[in-house]
Swiss-Prot record:
Its EC number is 2.7.1.78. This is Polyribonucleotide 5'-hydroxyl-kinase Clp1. It is found in: Nucleus. It is an enzyme of class 2 (transferase). InterPro entries: Clp1 (IPR028606), Clp1/Grc3 (IPR045116), Clp1_C (IPR010655), Clp1_C_sf (IPR038238), Clp1_N (IPR032324), Clp1_N_sf (IPR038239), CLP1_P (IPR032319), P-loop_NTPase (IPR027417).
């Protein structure tokens, strides 16, 4: 369950047996080829001539890149290029209407802030990206992180979108030091992410816990910046969820305060931009940016499949080259909890306890058949085995309950590491995963 267990496999050689119709696209300067792969067959792309990039990662000429079903990508060129495509994507067209120049100008501004921080011994920009669902927040974060790394920086990606899980699996928040551009096919290398258990794909299920974990991430990031000058100068990009009203909006304000952000980038929603402009401190630079025309709304089914794919990649690797372990553990060998007790009338609460306190309570879960297929976070215990503050401790890894035998009192689990489990507490998620591989 060490950080090595979370690492992604290395790139594999292209499959020369790939077949499908072939199309050549000639892209003029400052245009992009937009792709959506929704069917059952992958699509392959090759840069034949010129220069191009995917969300800030440069493409290597004459190398084939595979985009599996569910992929959405934009191949952008600053100077013009030729791209060969194999397969039948649901969407494939060239667009001149792209916000890339605005995004590049944003990166230039952030780099100027980093250079100034370097000269004056200050900290670099801390950037929060906000906006409703499906406007390209994660893509903008990836783009700006890639550009920063290509300039020699080492920014930190902070993932607060519990429904997506770009740092780890869905149902978590986390942070990742980005040291190299994202792989076109696999994303950022998650060698040693810092991950915390939330347990659900929507912050509203336990907003008290969500805000507490946000504060915890900010505290740990501050400690790292205090001890690592390069990390401090490089700053961070904070990706947020698409819930921007009511408690979701207050969670945005809380995140901005906890991380002491300097810059807020709002995608596509003028009302949110004006609200943040009004409610954030005057020194915070709040910018309204357009979303890309390639950003389209995803259905609930598409989101669910995307979450399943993230969990599958955790256990099997992006290319299916990892081999998780299946083994049994006895009921008596594990302690399983859920963070947050069910709401009860205030009159029934213990004296001095509030509903908010109830949201952070560890509730024991008795192993049973209803645990089947649930994802669980593995939280290591210290030498004394104390369970205080478990909800604020970082996660070592994840397991899935694939079977429950109540007669033999055993659980069958899927784990990235072999038995035995470390001395730990298991925190159950609302998220289920059917291991059909």
């Amino acid at each position: 369950m060490s950080s090595e267990d979370l690492s992604a496999p290395g790139p594999s050689a292209p499959d020369s047996s790939f077949t499908g119709p072939s199309t050549k696209f000639e892209l003029e300067r400052e245009t992009e080829l937009r792709l959506e792969v929704e069917g059952t067959d992958p699509v392959r792309v090759e840069l034949v001539s010129g220069l191009a990039e995917v969300f800030g990662t440069e493409l290597t000429r004459n190398k084939k890149y595979t985009f599996p079903p569910g992929s959405r990508a934009a191949i952008f060129t600053w100077h013009g290029c030729t791209v060969q495509l194999w397969g039948s994507p649901d969407v494939a067209y060239v667009s001149r209407d792209t916000p890339m120049l605005l995004y590049l100008n944003t990166q230039v501004g952030l780099e100027q802030m980093r250079a100034q921080a370097e000269r004056e011994g200050e900290r670099g920009p801390r950037v929060l990206v906000a906006g409703p669902s499906d406007v390209g927040k994660s893509t903008l974060c990836r783009l700006l992180l890639n550009y920063a790394v290509r300039r020699g920086r080492r920014p930190t990606l902070v993932e607060l979108d519990v429904g997506q899980g770009s740092v780890s699996v869905p149902g978590t928040v986390g942070a990742l030091c980005v040291e190299r551009p994202a792989d076109v096919e696999e994303g950022f290398s998650a060698q040693a992410p810092l991950v915390y258990h939330f347990g659900s794909t929507t912050p509203g299920t336990n907003i008290k816990l969500y805000n507490k974990l946000t504060s915890r991430l900010a505290h740990v990031f501050n400690l790292r910046c205090d001890s690592n000058r390069r990390a401090s100068v490089s700053g961070c990009l904070i990706n947020t969820c698409g819930w921007v009203k009511g408690s979701g909006y207050q969670a945005l304000i809380h995140a901005a305060s906890a991380f002491e952000v300097d810059v807020v980038l709002v995608l596509d929603q003028e009302r949110l931009y004006n609200d943040l402009l009004r409610d954030l401190p005057h020194f915070v630079r709040t910018l309204l940016l357009p979303k890309s025309g390639g950003a389209s709304e995803r259905s609930k089914e598409c989101r669910r499949e995307s979450r399943d794919q993230r969990v599958r990649e955790y256990f099997y690797g992006p290319r299916g080259s990892l081999y998780p372990h299946a083994f049994e553990i006895k009921f008596s060998e594990v302690r399983v909890y859920k963070v947050g007790a069910p709401s009860i009338p205030d009159s029934c609460l213990p004296l001095g306890m509030s509903q908010e306190d109830n949201q952070l309570k560890l509730v024991p879960v008795t192993p049973g058949r209803d645990m089947a297929h649930h994802l669980l976070s593995v939280v290591p215990l210290d030498g004394g085995g104390a369970e205080e503050g478990i909800e604020e401790r970082s996660v070592a890894g994840f397991i899935v309950i694939t079977g429950v035998d109540t007669e033999r009192q055993t659980l069958t689990v899927l784990s990235p590491a072999p038995r035995p489990l470390p001395k730990c507490v298991l925190l159950i998620m609302d998220i289920r995963f059917m291991d059909l591989k």
